[in-house]
Amino acid sequence: MIDLEELRQLTMFAREGTLSKAAEKLHISQPTLSRTMQNLEEVFGVSLFVRGKNKIEFNETGWKAAERAEHLLAEGEEVLRHVREFYKRLHTITVESCAPAPLW
């Protein structure tokens, strides 16, 4: 099962281009991020990266996974926003009054 944090890490790698830059932005170690990327490949059951001597890059499947992950994260944020707005409306008391008008 994939969690939202793994998807967030995948999209950060897509934005930053390197594991070290992405790990720095995420405030995690590079080996931790590398393990997450390996875990995602295992969960998906496909290769997401082209690995070089000291470099890792997305292959086409990896770019597609990152694109979809971005959409899922945005949708997750939208769900949070809607639920919070609903809760506020449910627990908001509206008081209306009418000020008396002068009679002269």
Question: Residue ranges of each PLM-predicted region?
Answer:
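Short alpha-helical "packing" element that flanks the helix-turn-helix/winged-helix DNA-binding module
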Residues: E6-F13, A65
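Short helix-boundary/capping micro-motifs
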Residues: T11-S29
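Residue cluster at the C-terminal edge of the helix-turn-helix DNA-binding motif
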Residues: E16, K25, N39-S47
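Helix-turn-helix DNA-binding elements, focusing on the entry/boundary residues of the two helices
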Residues: T18-L19, M37, R51
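A short LG(V/I)-centered, amphipathic sequence patch enriched
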Residues: E41-W63
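Alpha-helical linker/hinge and terminal dimerization helices associated
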Residues: V43-F44, A65-Y87
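N-terminal winged-helix
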Residues: E78-R81, K88-W104
